[in-house]
Amino acid sequence: MALVLIILSFFSCKSSTNQQESKPITSSPRPDWLDGKWQRTNDEENKKTYEHWQKVSDSLYLVLGFTLQQKDTVWKENVQLILKDSMWSYDVFMAGNPNPTSFLFTHIIDSSFVCENAQNEFPKKIAYTLKGDTMRAVISGGGPEILYLFVKE
């Protein structure tokens, strides 16, 4: 009987460890380096893309992303980075859809983060990295990888 309890205890601990390894990031450095206005440098001809990041609190960042062609807005999205239920989430709000598409953080350090949503058609992965004065954003998974390069205004 004691042997059975020892074996069950071992498997119980082993299972718990595996579950912890697959959880999204719950505590981390804050992505304060994103705060400010950014302009895309590798845009399509005749287009200008911007991301305006605002730190509202230690647990909320708001983002307005938009693309102009001439003086017309041809693309727009609102994003929030929010710490909810002890997990960071990158929530994308698109026009015409009241529910956000959420990506959970899987990696974050002082100058980069990665968030993922395996259920989303495209993209499944979003990564932001700061190198010098350039912010690099890459969306991938479920379609072609797209690179966005930004400089702070």
Spans of model-derived segments:
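Tryptophan-anchored aromatic micro-motifs
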Residues: 32-47, 61-65
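C-terminal motif of bacterial Sec signal peptides marking the signal peptidase cleavage site
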Residues: 9-12
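Short, surface-exposed coil-to-beta transition loops
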Residues: 46-50, 74-78, 99-101, 121-125, ...
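N-terminal helix-cap/turn-to-beta initiation motif at the start of protein domains
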Residues: 23-37, 80
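Edge beta-strand at a domain terminus
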Residues: 100, 129-153
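Contiguous, well-ordered beta-strand patches that form the walls/edges
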Residues: 72-120
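Bacterial signal peptide processing site
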Residues: 14-16
